[in-house]
């Protein structure tokens, strides 16, 4: 299930690049972010697929005066949400201003910058490992849009009916 993307781009930009990391049947083990005072410049991922580490393409220019590596404790830690801010007006810099990643055990970020001219977003993906990947766009000035894939649960949880029957048998009428 494709959710988003959120963000905005400069209509004057002629170099918009779409990217999609949702086709991987693996888990993200690391996220690489290049950012600065203008916002998120680039994002890149490392996946675990078939027992091997696979590095995605970098999405955005490798610039910005800050670089962060988010290391997830694979296979015990997984993404449960992403939130952030994007600039709502046209500008000649990245519109994705800040990103924060939530997992089942930790919170990473926010990375980038915050401001009153920004719109906020949040994708909350539940407590179980349903995250399926990222997608978005970038141009020469940085990350413009970002969205996520959700893999809904495909197995029903087992319901313990033993306790329910026991509880019902203790009810006394009259």
Curated annotation (Swiss-Prot):
SMART domains per record: Jacalin
Q: Which residues form the Jacalin-type lectin domain?
A: 1-152
The knockout note for this entry states:
Susceptible to systemic infection by tobacco etch virus (TEV).
Keyword rRNA processing in annotation: no
Which GO terms of the molecular function aspect are on file?
Answer: carbohydrate binding
Purpose of the protein: Required for the restriction of long-distance movement of the pathogenic tobacco etch virus (TEV) without causing a hypersensitive response or inducing systemic acquired resistance.
Q: Which family does the similarity line name? A: Belongs to the jacalin lectin family.
Q: What is this protein called?
A: Protein RESTRICTED TEV MOVEMENT 1
Q: What is the lineage of its organism?
A: Eukaryota, Viridiplantae, Streptophyta, Embryophyta, Tracheophyta
Q: Which gene encodes it?
A: RTM1
């Amino acid at each position: 299930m494709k959710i988003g993307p959120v963000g905005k781009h400069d209509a004057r930009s002629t170099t918009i690049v779409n990217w999609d990391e949702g086709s991987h049947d693996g888990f993200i083990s690391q996220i690489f972010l290049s950012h600065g005072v203008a916002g998120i410049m680039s994002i890149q991922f490392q996946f675990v697929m078939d027992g091997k580490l696979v590095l995605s393409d970098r999405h955005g220019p490798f610039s910005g005066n800050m670089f962060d590596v988010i290391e997830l404790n694979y296979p015990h830690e997984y993404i449960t949400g992403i939130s952030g801010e994007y600039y709502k007006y046209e500008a000649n810099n990245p519109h994705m201003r800040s990103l924060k990643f939530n997992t089942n055990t930790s919170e990473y970020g926010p990375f980038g910058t915050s401001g009153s001219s920004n719109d906020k977003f949040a994708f909350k993906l539940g407590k179980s490992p349903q995250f399926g990947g990222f997608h978005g766009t970038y141009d020469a000035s940085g990350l413009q849009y970002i969205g996520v894939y959700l893999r809904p649960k495909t197995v029903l949880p087992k319901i313990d009916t033993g306790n329910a029957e026991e509880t019902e048998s203790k009810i006394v009428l009259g």
